[in-house]
């Protein structure tokens, strides 16, 4: 599934985000939007240049040996069914690799 295009210019500066960062142990029950999920995937491993060699996270020798997976629970992300997803940075898309709410199995 192709993800929505990421935002390059956020609503808050990096400095403000760092200054206002707090640990929260009480979470909202509101599901993430597909746009929010897309932004998280891109920030973790997204392509940051047109040639496709550079990503949002550094990697020695540009090897990028780590893949990004997300386990999505029932009604946790609008537009995604529950299951495990693999993120493909080259196409900025996710693919379902296992169906069902797997949170208890991976927690």
Q: Where do the PLM segments sit?
A:
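N-terminal amphipathic, basic helical "cap/leader" segment at the start of enzyme domains
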Residues: 1-107
């Amino acid at each position: 599934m192709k993800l929505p295009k990421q935002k390059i210019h956020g609503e808050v500066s990096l400095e403000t985000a760092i200054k206002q960062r707090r640990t929260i142990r009480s979470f909202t029950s509101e599901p993430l939007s597909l746009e929010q999920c897309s932004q998280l995937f891109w920030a973790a491993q997204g392509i940051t240049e047109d040639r496709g060699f550079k990503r949002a996270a550094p990697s020695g020798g540009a090897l990028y040996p780590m893949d990004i997976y997300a386990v999505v629970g029932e009604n946790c992300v609008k537009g995604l069914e529950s299951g495990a997803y693999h993120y493909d940075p080259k196409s900025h898309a996710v693919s379902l690799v296992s169906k069902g709410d797997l949170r208890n199995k991976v927690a």
